[in-house]
Swiss-Prot record:
GO molecular function: DNA binding
Key words, A-Z: Cytoplasm, DNA-binding, Transcription, Transcription regulation
Protein's name according to its UniProt entry: Probable transcriptional regulatory protein str0195
GO CC annotation: cytosol
Gene Ontology biological process terms from the UniProt entry: regulation of DNA-templated transcription
HAMAP family recorded: Transcrip_reg_TACO1 (MF_00693), Transcrip_reg_TACO1_YeeN (MF_00918)
Entry-linked PANTHER family: TRANSLATIONAL ACTIVATOR OF CYTOCHROME C OXIDASE 1
Pfam family, one: Transcrip_reg
Localization: Cytoplasm
Source organism superkingdom: Bacteria
Similarity remark: Belongs to the TACO1 family. YeeN subfamily.
Main location: cytoplasm
């Protein structure tokens, strides 16, 4: 059993509520939409990267005006450049963190991430110090009960699917990252229209459990990292968070 299956099934509603209430998430999606639209056509039908970002923005309840503004900006003559980055580090008691960024100022972002680690009980590590303990996977979550039927649908569509789990009325599909879009198309072809999560995730090979002061310190560290405007994603190996 994938150790993250229970995690996705349990936190998806909480995640959606949190994202929907957080205007910072909107701004971060605005940047991501702009970058995707700028790198290709500003039309999701001819730009799969943009289509994927817009699908995720919908799940996070990003307002239409935020999306339209980002796409309009990409259509203009602006030459603002954003660079993807990844930082890795450690929290208390065996906890590991990966931070993905999208920034127009790499030096600023690197300094901010290092400060967030240092001031909140963590340590930033070298590139590769943590990521080898995580696997990149496609993750899809939607309402449903019959994991076996979904698994069969995906196999018939020649999707490289790793696992399908059903729990608490939700189905979680894990795919190889290159097959995430293929899996989505197969599910849509079989009548599945609404998705709670469609993400490329870094999934820990093992999880740790934190308690008491360690857990509070770790939560503060994650909050500090996620509060940075340039931080797009934070992955970690702490259970039940």
């Amino acid at each position: 059993m994938n150790p993250m299956g229970r995690k996705w099934a349990n936190i998806v509603a909480k995640k959606t509520a949190k994202d929907g209430a957080n205007s910072k998430i909107y701004a971060k999606f605005g940047v991501e939409i702009y970058v995707a639209a700028k790198q290709g056509e500003p039309d999701p039908e001819s730009n799969s990267a943009l289509k994927f970002v817009l699908e995720r923005a919908k799940q996070a309840q990003v307002p239409k005006h935020v999306i339209d503004k980002a796409i309009d900006k990409a259509k203009g003559n602006t030459d603002e450049t954003f660079v993807e980055g990844r930082y890795e580090g450690f929290g208390p008691n065996g906890s590991m963190i990966i931070v993905d960024t999208l920034t127009s100022n790499v030096n600023r972002t690197a300094a901010n991430v290092r400060t967030a680690f240092g001031k909140n009980g963590g340590n930033m590590g070298a590139s590769g110090s943590v990521s080898y303990m995580f696997d990149k996977k496609g993750v899809i979550v939607f309402a449903g009960e019959d994991a076996d039927a979904i698994f069969e649908q995906l196999l018939e569509a020649d999707v490289d699917v790793e696992d399908v789990e059903a729990e608490d009325g939700s189905i979680t599909v894990y795919t190889e990252p290159t097959d995430l879009h293929k899996a989505l198309e197969a599910l849509r072809a079989n009548g599945q229209e609404e998705f709670q999560v469609t993400e490329l995730e870094m999934i820990p090979q093992t999880e740790v459990t934190l308690e008491g002061e360690d857990l509070e310190t770790f939560k503060g560290l994650i909050d500090a990292l996620e509060a940075d405007d340039d931080v797009q994603k934070v992955y970690h190996n702490v259970a039940d968070m």
